[in-house]
From Swiss-Prot:
<feature type="binding site">
    <location>
        <position position="921"/>
    </location>
    <ligand>
        <name>Zn(2+)</name>
    </ligand>
</feature>
<keyword id="KW-0648">Protein biosynthesis</keyword>
<dbReference type="InterPro" id="IPR002301">
    <property type="entry name" value="Ile-tRNA-ligase"/>
</dbReference>
<dbReference type="GO" id="GO:0005829">
    <property type="term" value="C:cytosol"/>
</dbReference>
<dbReference type="InterPro" id="IPR050081">
    <property type="entry name" value="Ile-tRNA_ligase"/>
</dbReference>
<feature type="short sequence motif" description="'HIGH' region">
    <location>
        <begin position="57"/>
        <end position="67"/>
    </location>
</feature>
<feature type="short sequence motif" description="'KMSKS' region">
    <location>
        <begin position="600"/>
        <end position="604"/>
    </location>
</feature>
<dbReference type="InterPro" id="IPR014729">
    <property type="entry name" value="Rossmann-like_a/b/a_fold"/>
</dbReference>
<keyword id="KW-0862">Zinc</keyword>
<dbReference type="GO" id="GO:0000049">
    <property type="term" value="F:tRNA binding"/>
</dbReference>
<dbReference type="InterPro" id="IPR023585">
    <property type="entry name" value="Ile-tRNA-ligase_type1"/>
</dbReference>
<dbReference type="GO" id="GO:0006428">
    <property type="term" value="P:isoleucyl-tRNA aminoacylation"/>
</dbReference>
<dbReference type="InterPro" id="IPR033708">
    <property type="entry name" value="Anticodon_Ile_BEm"/>
</dbReference>
<dbReference type="Pfam" id="PF06827">
    <property type="entry name" value="zf-FPG_IleRS"/>
</dbReference>
<dbReference type="InterPro" id="IPR002300">
    <property type="entry name" value="aa-tRNA-synth_Ia"/>
</dbReference>
<feature type="compositionally biased region" description="Polar residues">
    <location>
        <begin position="1"/>
        <end position="14"/>
    </location>
</feature>
<protein>
    <recommendedName>
        <fullName>Isoleucine--tRNA ligase</fullName>
        <ecNumber>6.1.1.5</ecNumber>
    </recommendedName>
</protein>
Length: 931
């Protein structure tokens, strides 16, 4: 007889190999066909809402690993919430205006934006933005992200733009919007002003020079033959110099250096001496900074210009001379201190970073090139005391990566002072995860200057302001804002560029300033894109005709930690300014993606990992598993090596699921499930371990600690199940009577474990759990998707503290037995564990635990025989456990090997009909497998 046919061996069609690159797109297609998003929304209608508001990625280029991390984290949260009793809609969005799109449109069309019709140009920009938004949408869906992909938000939608105009108008109404001459970050390459959030720092080599400003009028304090020395790394700003700032409380010295009388801060004299290569410096006099106020110096190369010595708290002793070259047109602090002294604001630089006619002999030169010319000029006039090159951190444009500079221009600003205190209070009312985010954004808002909201670009939402051609004053009223809002809602912002000002204003408009003006012109600047995305809390969350399921404030904003100064900040500013409240309840930030050495990913380093390539080679679930595997609050590393580890972890989880499925082929949970009180103790312990896992994982999801979800589930599959419970019950599953209580009890646990694992893993391994769900037995009707199930609940009945204590002890004992078996295997006493007989010598609590379950010990240790003895009877060569009252001996089991269960038994051969079986197997075969 072929006894293998009498075994209940695993049967399942669930494939061992994931083959994810082929299977996942099929699953994705299925989700689209059944309109899964809609189905989930219908199922959860009327439940408590959970709104995760999507920070819009920029509609430019394919998605990268950072996008993957961000979108998968959001998807994990939304899926968890929708399986936990919440109505959790997810509306993806895109940031669709701004410079990079303009640049790409210019590049692809080969045009000059100054020579093209703005309406045509904007149409090209729109096409480009929507093309990439659609591409990214497909790529995000390939990652398994569930959302309202048919109805996303774009910042270029007419309704969105109209709401943005309303936000701007409300801020203007409250007096927060003003026009002013002020130094702003300026990018010559992009020809536009930049907000602080658009600035990044990178190394740059600059000239470091020490320059003499001869004293013209010492005010009875400084001698006429002295010179105040300044230090600068931007020689090109010297043509705009009008003052020298000193700190009122620092000590300054008049010193003889290289046969010249110079003035520098006392504390910096030594470093100055070294910098200019002087051997000696003799101090001739000492002054308090405030004594030098209003001393007049001569500009080093503009003969008709004086430079006034003024006092400034911004002066430091970190480097230089303690006397700071001050050009109010090229620096924020310079501008502030210059205002106090009513100094002129000079900025003789045009949009492209070239000197204008006001720059005199430097006219037409690009500022960075002019450094050289200016240094030559200083040398000729004997005004240069020292010159070296230094490498330092310098602001660059985050778009084009070119160095930028401060330039005073007329710009539109949002006055942060108007709502700063409210914003700071709002920050305290929001939950920040990780908690350090709170202080980070608080300090940023507390210290930030006014927000420059205007940009000199075409592709954006226009600043809705008119100018009266009679009196020249700007006009922004409730009437004009309401009118423009209505026009934009109907036609989009293109209408601003298509029509003249007089066609855009309300027909009845008369200039409110002069009372007679009827002829108008319109503002040509557009809004900062941070104002676009920063208005989404009203433009999306409060736009019921487009997204009725959304509501304000959002429960959660989740982006990279760079958004403390970006989207979190701009959203907070517009929300507090307009509504007095924050736009979000909780803000969660993640780190950035790096390689395994912690380096930023870059093409030049060759360490860029393409998520789409991973999807086509390994599968999106491998990437999703990676996102869940590390603490995303720090930077996340990814490399081929890490991907290999993820694939291995995935394989273990998949194999566990396959084993569970394979042993449930004949199990109907409705008919065959065994009641808890009828389960053997081992099975009750297994259920307790499962429900401890459920409790831990649900708490981790609630706390956004997905790495705990991953490690707990992985550990459960590999250790609690595979290396313990599943190993022990294999004999029962395969050899017992198919419908027996002992087998059905084990299957009950397997079913509960599979059912819980599928639910717990769905937010992470969305594709794989969908596949498992197709094959597993279910109670009632099978739902259209695994994502429509609810999270498992913890059953407190399964939590038995006494049982847990007892089995903790059994685990310790088992560990000692397995160790001894391993030694016996190495010493060739046995081949595998079933060839072993184990003698245990026990006392105390070990005896207490093992004695009542003596009959189950062969199963528990997966050996053929276990004998229990008192510890006192232990022979000298028995192995003693270090921390337990236990000694053990392993020997070869007596008797023959049963052909069916492979255990050794002294009675194998006693049954003539089944001579190769042990009594247990012979009975099962006779009663259930004999024709």
């Amino acid at each position: 007889m072929d006894y293998s046919k009498t075994l209940n061996l695993p049967q399942t069609q669930f494939p061992m190999r994931g083959n994810l690159p082929q299977r996942e797109p099929e699953t994705q297609k299925y989700w689209q066909e059944i309109d899964l998003y809609k189905k989930v929304q219908e199922k959860n209608k009327g439940k408590t809402k959970f709104i995760l508001h999507d920070g819009p990625p920029y509609a430019n280029g394919h998605i990268h690993l950072g996008h993957t991390l961000n979108k998968v984290l959001k998807d994990i949260i939304v899926k968890y919430r929708s399986m936990s009793g919440y109505d959790a809609p997810y509306v993806p969005g895109w940031d669709t205006h701004g410079l990079p799109i303009e640049q790409q449109a210019i590049k692809q069309l080969g045009i000059n934006r100054h020579q093209v019709n703005p309406v045509e140009f904007r149409a090209k920009c729109k096409d480009y933005a929507l093309k990439w938004a659609n591409t990214q949408s497909e790529e995000f869906q390939r990652l398994g992200v569930r959302g309202d992909w048919e109805n996303p938000y774009y910042t270029l939608l007419p309704q969105y733009e109209a709401t943005q105009i309303r936000v701007f108008g409300e801020m203007a109404k409250k007096g927060y919007i003003y026009k002013g001459l002020k130094p702003v970050y300026w990018c010559a390459s992009c020809e536009t002003a930049l907000a602080e959030a658009e600035v990044e720092y990178a190394d740059k080599t600059s000239p470091s020079i020490y320059v003499k400003f001869p004293v013209k009028d010492g005010k009875g304090v400084l001698p006429q033959d002295a010179a105040v020395v300044i230090w600068t790394t931007t020689p090109w700003t010297l043509p705009a110099n009008v003052a020298i700032s000193v700190h009122p409380e620092f000590e300054y010295v008049l010193a003889a250096v290289q046969n010249q009388k110079i003035v520098v801060a006392k504390e910096l004299l030594e470093s100055f001496k070294q910098a200019v290569g002087a051997e000696e410096a003799e101090i001739l006099a000492t002054y308090q900074g405030e004594q030098l106020e209003r001393v007049v110096c001569q500009h080093p190369f503009i003969d008709e210009r004086e430079s006034l010595v003024i006092l400034g708290e911004h002066v430091t002793l970190d480097a230089g001379t303690g006397a700071v070259h001050t050009a109010p047109g090229h620096g924020e602090e310079d501008f502030m201190v210059g205002k106090k002294y009513e100094l002129p604001v000079l900025a003789p630089i045009d949009n492209r970073g070239r000197f204008t006619s006001e720059g005199g002999k430097f006219q037409g030169q690009f500022i960075m090139d002019a450094n050289k010319t200016i240094i030559e000029e200083l040398k000729e006039r004997d005004a240069l005391m020292g010159h070296v090159s230094i490498k330092h951190q310098y602001p660059h444009c985050w778009r084009c990566k070119q160095p930028i500079f401060f330039r005073a221009t007329e710009q539109w600003f949002a006055s942060v002072d108007g709502f700063r205190q409210e914003a700071l209070q709002a920050i305290r009312n929001v939950k920040w995860v990780p908690s350090w985010g709170e202080d980070r954004i608080y300090n940023m808002v507390e210290g930030r200057g006014d927000w420059c909201v205007s940009r000199q670009r075409t592709w954006g939402v226009p600043i809705p302001i008119f100018y009266c051609n009679d009196c020249g004053k700007e006009i922004i009223t409730e009437e004009t804002i309401s009118h423009i809002e209505k026009l934009f809602r109907e036609h989009g912002s293109d209408i601003w560029f298509a029509k003249e000002a007089n066609e855009l204003v309300p027909a009845s408009l008369t200039c409110p300033h002069c009372g007679k003006g009827k002829d108008f012109r319109k503002e040509t600047d557009t809004m900062d894109v941070w104002f676009d995305s920063g208005s989404s809390h009203l433009a999306v969350l409060n736009q019921p005709e487009l997204w009725p399921e959304q509501q304000r404030p959002a429960d959660l904003y989740l982006e990279g930690s760079d958004q403390h100064r970006g989207w979190f900040n701009s959203s907070l500013s517009t929300s507090v300014a307009v509504t007095g409240k924050p736009p979000y309840k909780t803000v969660l930030t993640h780190g950035f993606t790096v390689d395994e050495k912690g380096r930023k990913m870059s093409k030049s380093l060759g360490n860029v990992v393409d998520p789409l390539k991973i999807c086509s080679q390994m599968g999106a679930d491998i990437l999703r598993l990676w996102v869940s595997s590390a603490d995303y609050r720090a930077d996340l590393a990814l490399s081929q090596n890490i991907l290999k580890q993820m694939t291995e972890s995935y394989r273990k989880i998949r194999n566990t699921a396959r084993f569970l499925l394979g042993n449930l082929y004949d199990f109907d949970p409705v008919k065959d499930k065994v009641a808890y009180d009828k389960l053997p103790e081992l099975d009750r312990v297994a259920l307790m371990e499962l429900h401890k896992l459920i409790k831990q994982v649900l708490a981790a999801y609630e706390n956004y600690e997905f790495h705990i979800v991953y490690h707990a589930v992985h550990n459960y599959c590999v250790v609690d199940l595979s290396a313990f419970y599943l190993d022990i019950i294999k004999d029962r599953l395969y050899t017992a009577v198919p419908g027996s209580l002992e087998r059905r009890a084990a299957q009950t646990v397997l079913y509960e474990a599979l059912d819980a694992l599928v639910r717990l893993l769905t937010p992470v391994l969305a594709f794989t759990t969908e596949e498992i769900y197709k094959y597993m037995p279910v109670v009632g009707d099978r739902l259209a998707s695994v994502q429509m199930l609810d999270m498992p609940e913890v059953n407190v009945e399964y939590m038995d503290v006494e049982l847990e204590k007892k089995w903790d002890k059994i685990h310790e004992i088992r560990k000692e037995v397995l160790k001894a078996l391993e030694v016996a295997r190495k010493n060739k006493v046995i081949g595998n564990a079933l060839e072993a007989k184990v003698d245990l010598y026990v006392a105390g609590d070990v005896e207490e635990v093992l004695k009542p379950m003596a009959a189950e010990l062969t199963t528990l240790f997966i050996v053929s025989k276990v004998n229990l003895h008192g510890l006192a009877a232990a022979p000298a060569d028995a192995v003693k456990a270090e921390e337990l009252e236990l000694a053990l001996q392993v020997a070869t089991a007596e008797g023959g090997k049963c052909e069916r269960c492979w255990m050794y038994h002294e009675e194998v051969g006693n049954d003539a009909e089944h001579a190769t079986l042990c009594p247990r197997c012979a009975t099962v075969v006779k009663e259930h497998h004999t024709a």
